[in-house]
């Protein structure tokens, strides 16, 4: 039976009880002791009435009336108990109704809370989904195409690459980056994929890095090959493979870098048991300067002669060259060489392999080490300007080598911001792969300062930054 039906039934009982009480009270009133004559009154009535009523019968009648009165009182008492029971039941019912009301209210509130929680959960889920999409979007923007499925595993490619320069702190930087918990380990620092082993394929390259089974625990992946910056083939290859990878470039005072490379090459020859270097630093510097000048001059004259020949052929002429553009030096650069850009830098690689440019050829190229390039690798503007044909400047983080010695914490902190990884304590900083050598003599030092001056000024203007090198 429902609560409402119970309430209606109790109300009917109460109404009925009131009616019964009224009737009984009326009967009680008419049969109450004051309504019946006492024995003295009856005796007096008998004596005065003269009708001669039987006194015993009157007493019996009075007893019967008293018995009825007692019975009525008992019934009234029972009725009183019944009314109390009814009131108690009514109170209990009311309490039950109140409890049910409160329970219903609590249920409603709980349901509202559940709905709110559900909505909040939905909102949270939606927010998490949005955040997840944003993370995926951000990840796809910063680190796209870095993982490929191969034989049930994910082989991941670098998110960042240290592209140069040689003898400018790349070993130090790679050592401390490998200590960061958010950066994956690689098999070796210099992989040389984009300049020397590109034909081995992308799977060969990917196997040099830490492998993953899912993207959930993926770390940043990087490598450091300082010879990438000075190879004209590297930039287009890297752009084709990892066009959104973050690039890191370390630059050192070009005078000091050139000398450091020379002494490093001597040690390298000893370690590899190669023939010793028979030329002094000064001799190699002047010879390389002649190669660069001859190659560039020959290339410029060849371009001018080529334009003249095309113009003469267009006008129906015989295509003869002017006297001032003829000569053997046009063969210094292969005329069928495919240009990556109009920058002279792209021709340097062919120049250093040309015996006609340099009477003793590429001195250490035949012994397996590219020592040649002490000057060219220090012409930073020419190299960076070429790379900007493929990568925007904001994608390249440039570190001044001299800052590594004076403020290594600041250098790594700025790099962590660039890579979007947490700041950590690297502990004590120690120099890495430092080559000790005697100081440079003043004459060759002055020559190099003057030689690099124009390139340095172009670099400062390009980056809007003064590196405060020797001038």
From Swiss-Prot:
This protein's UniProt keywords: Glycoprotein, Membrane, Signal-anchor, Transferase, Transmembrane, Transmembrane helix
TM segment ranges: 13-33
Sequence ranges on the Lumenal membrane side: 34-471
Single GO MF annotation: sulfotransferase activity
Subcellular location, record wording: Membrane
Residues that carry a glycan: 47, 324, 344
Family membership: Belongs to the sulfotransferase 1 family.
GO biological process: defense response to bacterium; defense response to Gram-negative bacterium; response to Gram-negative bacterium; response to yeast
Protein name: Membrane-associated sulfotransferase kil1
A matching Pfam family: Sulfotransfer_1
InterPro entries xrefs: NST/OST (IPR037359), P-loop_NTPase (IPR027417), Sulfotransferase_dom (IPR000863)
Membrane topology, from the record: Single-pass type II membrane protein
